[in-house]
Structures are given as structure tokens and as C-alpha cells.
UniProtKB/Swiss-Prot annotation:
EC number from the UniProt entry: 7.5.2.12
Family: Belongs to the ABC transporter superfamily. Arabinose importer (TC 3.A.1.2.2) family.
Entry's localization field: Cell inner membrane
Name of the protein in question: Arabinose import ATP-binding protein AraG
Sections of the chain in a coiled coil: none
GO CC annotations on file: plasma membrane
This protein's UniProt keywords: ATP-binding, Cell inner membrane, Cell membrane, Membrane, Nucleotide-binding, Repeat, Sugar transport, Translocase, Transport
Family annotation (Gene3D superfamilies): P-loop containing nucleotide triphosphate hydrolases
SUPFAM superfamilies, per the entry: P-loop containing nucleoside triphosphate hydrolases
Self-association state and partner proteins as the record states: The complex is composed of two ATP-binding proteins (AraG), two transmembrane proteins (AraH) and a solute-binding protein (AraF).
Topology with respect to the bilayer: Peripheral membrane protein
Amino acid sequence: MTAQSPYLSFHGIGKEFPGVKALSDISFSCHAGQIHALMGENGAGKSTLLKILSGNYSPSAGEIHIQGKPVQFSNTMDALNAGVAIIYQELHLVPEMTVAENIYLGQLPHKYGMVNYSLLRYEAKLQLQHLGLDIDPDTPLKYLSIGQWQMVEIAKALARNAKIIAFDEPTSSLSAREIEQLFRVITELRSEGRIILYVSHRMEEIFALSDAITVFKDGRYVCTFDDMQQVNHESLVQAMVGRNLGNIYGYAPRPHGEDRLTLKDVKAPGVKSTISLNVKQGEIVGLFGLVGAGRSELMKGLFGATKITSGQVLLDGKPLVVNSPIDAIRQGVMLCPEDRKADGIIPVHSVRDNINISARRKSLKAGFIINNQWEADNAAQRIDALNIKTPSDEQLIMNLSGGNQQKVILGRWLSEEMKVILLDEPTRGIDVGAKHEIYHVIYELANQGIAVLFASSDLPEVLGLADRIIVMREGAVSGELLHADATEQKVLSLAMLRIPDIESAVA
């Protein structure tokens, strides 16, 4: 293998499950000392490829080569022993064990048949120092932040001398400071000659970090951009979705009616100060603020998931009393929660059940018999209207992509007489094509006169969608801007948000 030869290469990789071809003829290469991004819509095949690389799946076709030699892994330990580590969104660590024990889990040093804790602490400390971390290796993992857990996963990979480290949506649960630290570590790993495979929907991260980008679509290889000077946002999006989305937000002003939702000095658990705001019929109002600003807590209170503790909420000028989500739904107030998997869907139930779970009460025969035909027709109507990608309405919702799960939740509320919809991080973890479709649904709801209140930590999204932006800081409203007047600088100034200097972190 010459100095210019790829360290890692995929040759005709295919993967089939019963009735589904997840990957077909994937071929591309990665070089040592390279951050190589993998991009594509949900379901494009990125995670499947990582699971093949890590030994979770066996390929149905093709070969993986490392340093020019074919390799085949039967399990994740085989892959780790060959220097391949995957850092998933759901971190695979043991909370009750110490940091040191987690780093060397499966290869604890022994002396006279017993664990050598002195050597274990020493070796773990070296790995943590390598990453620039000041963490006591004797600390139980459960006391660390998610960002620190992730660093322990990286230290675990380095303890096995991993030369190939893949990250799957690594920043989805991190603070700005933790993201900055992660980028510093990733660029340091690159400088040591390691290959970094990086999967993310966040394009600003991809452009800040990557040396090359490979795009997947529908389980197939599309292209590799290996000259970052020749790729921009538009060309990358077009490669991912197979079409030019143009202005992804597609904002157009629309007439607004009377005040539909009004908050007067409202407080809820987790909201530190009183909140006053209003949303008109057909208006889209965006809530922006730091993590901890109280946006999600406010929405939970309005939906009855928690209790409004003071102040007054009005719906169409009349007091809105909500003691439970059922109360909210019956009065036309719906919520798409931030954590859709935990709070928005019933994972082991079908798409049909998840769409109909709220409206079922309206279709019961004789007050207690489920009307299967009505539910099938209603589910089919929502699946068609929202372009929900599913083999059938009987598919378990847990098997759908994040974007399609979100559309199922929206379809559930379309079955109700909606007056207000509360959207908490509506596109988090969703690919750009699905985002475009969800934005279209939001505009359609507003065009029907529904009041839309959405919270998002994606500032371009807030700027692109909202007729009006309300900025929250530490549980209080710090300012308000109209769409025409809003800029990134103005919003961040009101939020007192320190912009992470991504470029300096990766320099």
C-alpha cells in the first residue's frame, strides 16, 4: 500500500433484510488523517453501513478493506480489536461503574488473578489526559454529563488503539461548550492520523469539520465531494435529495386573524419568570433561547402535561383551563413534543394506531367498539396527505425514520379540530428533505387559520419560518422581532447567546 492509498475502503457493500434492500453497491474510500462525513436523508443507509463496519451486521455483498486487506467482523469486539470504534447517539456505557472501569471494560488489567485497580486508574488517567480531560477516573459514570460520557466513549476507543472512529449524530444532546470540546478532540484525532467518519444532519458542522463528504440516497452511493472548496450548501442538498429545494423555508407572508392564544403573566414548572405573549389566527410564532430558557416547560404547561401555576391563558379571548393533555386536545390545543420517541409515539404500536390514538374516541361504535374501517381510512388519508414513507399502516412506528415519526404525530393532530399547535423542536434529528416537507405542513396549518407556536434551537429555522420571533432567556421573554426585522445578530443579542467559534475549534 503506497502513501497515497486509502486506509479504509468499501467495495460493493450490500445489505438486505427480509423484503428490504438497505444498501446496494456502496463503494468509496477514506484516507488516514481525514474527517470524512457521511450524509443523506433518514433511511439513506448511513447507519446501516456503520453497523456493518462495526460488526453489528454482516454484509450481504461486498468487502471492507483496511490497509488494502479484506476484513470481516463477526461482532463489535472483532471490530474493536481491528481498530474500529463507533460512537453512537445512545452511548453504550455502564452508569454504575467508574470512568476507568468503563474505559477498560472487557480488558481490565489483572494481577494475581484480581483486577489491578492501581494500574487501571493510571492507564485511564493517561487516556483522559490524552483528550485534555480533567476527570477523576474513580468517578461513577452516572455523575457525569452526556458530553463527558461521550468523551469516555472516545477514551474507550483510544484504549483499544482505534485507528477508525465513527461518530453518529454526536452533537444532538450536547451544549455549545461540549460541542466545542468535541470538535477540538476530533481535530486532534485527525492530526494523529486517525480516520474520522462523521454522520450529522447539521450542515454547519459538516462544512466546519470535514475534509470529504460522501452522500447516500435510498441505500445507494451518490457521490463523494473530496474538494471542500468546490461544494456548497445547495449542491450538497441537491445530491442528498435528488432535487434542488431552492429556498428550503419558502417563507411567504399571510394574513393573520384575531388573537387566538394569549398568555398573561403565565408561569409553569421550570419557567422562572412570568411569560406574556400572543399568537394570532394563522400566525407562526417562533420561540428561541438557550437550553434552559424554559421553552419546553412552557409548552408542556400549555398542553396540560404540567400545571400552569399562575397567570391566565386565553383561547379566542376566553379562559383556557387545562388540567391534562385530554383537556387540551378537546379544546383544540395540540403538542408535538421535543422528545418524540419518549413522549410523542407509542413505539411498539403501528402507524395506524399512532395516528388514531387521539381521535379514536370519535369513531367508536356504540361507545366502546373500535371502528376499524374508519381508522384504516383515516390513517390512509393522513399517510397520503403527509407523504409518510411506510410499507403499510400496520408497520411499527419504531421502524420509521425520525422525519416520518414526526409526520405521524402531525397526522394524529390533523384528525382533531385543531386551533393551536405547539411544536417543540419539530425538526430535531430530521434530514433536510423531511424538514422541507414538515415546513410545508406548518405553512398549510397556518393558512387554515391555526395558530402555530414553535420552539427551536435551530436559529436559521426560526428566522426562516416565523412571522414573529419571541426570544427567551433564563425563563423570561427578553425581546420580540418581526420576520422582516429579524437577523441572526439581533436574535443572538437578545438571547445573550455566545456563538461557538466553530472555526477556531477546528483550526
